[in-house]
């Protein structure tokens, strides 16, 4: 068996072992969030609104905390949109 075949065999073995361990872990997590009810459970899984702070690049105006985005020169001399 050459080196390449040995490496492939080890990768396959590691993948199989990882899948077995992941299956066992998933069973342990099945009831992890059952103690939370109603609004408390919604807060855990609700995505909090995030905004881009001023001075950071902004792809869309609605993602800026200030709700405004203008073209400004960056450190490389290129013009990019940044949150105000």
From Swiss-Prot:
Expressed by the venom gland. Keywords: Calcium channel impairing toxin, Cleavage on pair of basic residues, Disulfide bond, Ion channel impairing toxin, Knottin, Secreted, Signal, Toxin, Voltage-gated calcium channel impairing toxin. It is found in: Secreted. One of its GO terms (molecular function) is toxin activity. The presence of a 'disulfide through disulfide knot' structurally defines this protein as a knottin. Inhibits insect, but not mammalian, voltage-gated calcium channels (Cav). This is Omega-hexatoxin-Hvn1b. The lineage of its organism: Eukaryota, Metazoa, Ecdysozoa, Arthropoda, Chelicerata.
